[in-house]
Amino acid sequence: AVKRFVFASSVYVYSREGSFYRCSKQAAESYIEEFQNVYNLDYTILRYGSLYGPRADSTNGLFRIVSNALETGVVRYNGSPDAFREYIHVEDAAKASVNALGDDFRNQSVVLTGQEPMRVVDLLKMLAEILGLPESVEFIEGDYVGHYNRTPYAYLPKLGRKYVAPFHVDLGQ
């Protein structure tokens, strides 16, 4: 029998950003929590930040930046030079994920990000130096759906407005 359901989510889950990816993670988390309420199946939700490391592919942001830099000789970033990220190596994320299987994390959501926020521009300059490329980094700024600058977290109260029809059939009719 399944004792606990473990779900890989995202720090974007309650962000203003993240587009349909955020929506899908948010819906999944709601289903998991409700399933626990109704059927008593324990869970742990792991909200990953910006991962990097071995076995990354073109779906990984840092992988795409490195691949493009190796192909073109220029480090480019689609986004703001003011952006911050908390990068976490996949091995650190894996160890943290295993630790999150402990009883302290039963029916909890756990944020797994790097040790501290890092300016994307600093990371990219470091990357350029490691690759032996000029330290000039090109930022392609624009309105990129799903990108945040400082934090993925947001306060997003959702209000519903009650409509009362001016004319209606009375309950006693």
Task: Label every model-predicted segment.
Residues S24-I32:
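Conserved catalytic Lys-bearing alpha helix of Rossmann-like short-chain dehydrogenase/reductases
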Residues S80-D82, N107-V110, M118, L124, ...:
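C-terminal "lid/loop" region of Rossmann-like NAD(P)-dependent oxidoreductases
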Residues S9-S10, Y31-P54:
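Conserved beta-loop-beta element that borders a ligand/cofactor-binding pocket
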Residues A1-C23:
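Conserved Rossmann-fold NAD(P)-dependent oxidoreductase catalytic core, especially the SDR/UDP-sugar
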Residues S97-L101, L124-L127, Q173:
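Hydrophobic "lid"/C-terminal helical patch
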Residues Q26, L51-R64, G73-V74, N78, ...:
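Glycine/proline-rich active-site loop of Rossmann-fold NAD(P)-dependent oxidoreductases
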Residues V90, V121-D122, D143-D170:
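Conserved C-terminal active-site "lid" loop/helix of NAD(P)H-dependent oxidoreductases
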